[in-house]
UniProtKB/Swiss-Prot annotation:
One of its GO terms (biological process) is cytoplasmic translational initiation. It comes from the Eukaryota. Gene3D superfamilies: YVTN repeat-like/Quinoprotein amine dehydrogenase. Component of the eukaryotic translation initiation factor 3 (eIF-3) complex. InterPro entries: eIF3i, WD40/YVTN_repeat-like_dom_sf, WD40_repeat_CS, WD40_repeat_dom_sf, WD40_rpt. It is found in: Cytoplasm. Belongs to the eIF-3 subunit I family. This is Eukaryotic translation initiation factor 3 subunit I. The lineage of its organism: Eukaryota, Fungi, Dikarya, Ascomycota, Saccharomycotina. GO terms for molecular function: RNA binding; translation initiation factor activity. GO terms for cellular component: eukaryotic 43S preinitiation complex; eukaryotic 48S preinitiation complex; eukaryotic translation initiation factor 3 complex, eIF3e; eukaryotic translation initiation factor 3 complex, eIF3m; nuclear periphery. The gene is TIF34. Signal peptide: none annotated. Pfam families: EIF3I.
Amino acid sequence: MRPILLQGHERPLTQLKYNREGDLLFSVARDKTICVWYSHNGERLGTLEGSGGANFSVDADPTTTIVATGSADQTARLWDIKTGKTIHSWNFKTTVKRVEFSPDGTKLIVLSEKMMGYPGGISVFNVKADVNATQETEPIMDIKPEEGADKFSFAVWSYGGKYIITAHADGSLSKYDGATGEFIASTQIHEEKFPITDLQPSPDKTYVITSSKDKTARLTDVDSLKLLKTYKTDTSMNSACITSKKDFVILGGGQDAKDVTTTSSRDGKFEARFYHKIFEDEVGRVKGHFGPLNCVVAHPNGGSYASGGEEGYIRIHHFDPSYFDFTYDVERFAAKE
């Protein structure tokens, strides 16, 4: 499984995102460049220029007509994917840490950071997947954390845009109504005092995976907020994703970036780890990065995955046939019956 190494950023990666078909991979980092890559060979299609600060989030609408980004310049922007030009921007009081289109592409979540005395929160905008359309300037709803809850760290849509699932800095998950923004429920998923470091939905958006500094990744059902599975590791995790074709989850992390100069890559545990989604066993690791993995993302068709590191490199791995042939004995026996 030879990786394709992508060099387009000078600073640590913050998020990777495939479009719905998976032919394009978008990357953002703590620099001003937003890169667009062909996922099958790693060729750079182009860059989106104009951001005024580090970029923390990126997402393409379902038709891959427009792209949304969130940045430290306190803006959320919409871009024309064909020309690379900004077509709209919304200004906020603090850094925009997360953007995500709804499954039908008509709404956009924008999550702003709590800092400098501003509470932050989630704004939901109506958007039009038309580069010539005039976008609405005001959100259709604003969501703030419940009283006593910690700040929002991440937010994703559930299936059909029914819920907005949010992750918090205290290790908890919350659920809000996707149409009204009304609070529904909250639960403690990870250990308290250990922040959630990533939140990604399953391919069908019926459950989510979270990673945390408590050295675990966990699956949670979006309807009940019930904990389904726990994947235990020996180092803090920065990211986790769910593969679509095989029953695996991929975890990425490693020793904190501030400590990496004192350790080798082996001691730092800078590997992508594969766990069986059902049995919770670790089944393999992929090395290559020489710093912590900041983000991992699975290709929509399940044939590859990409990882982004603290060192600024992206690695795309296309799976070998042996990956698809691997099964547990119980899976083989069940298939024969």
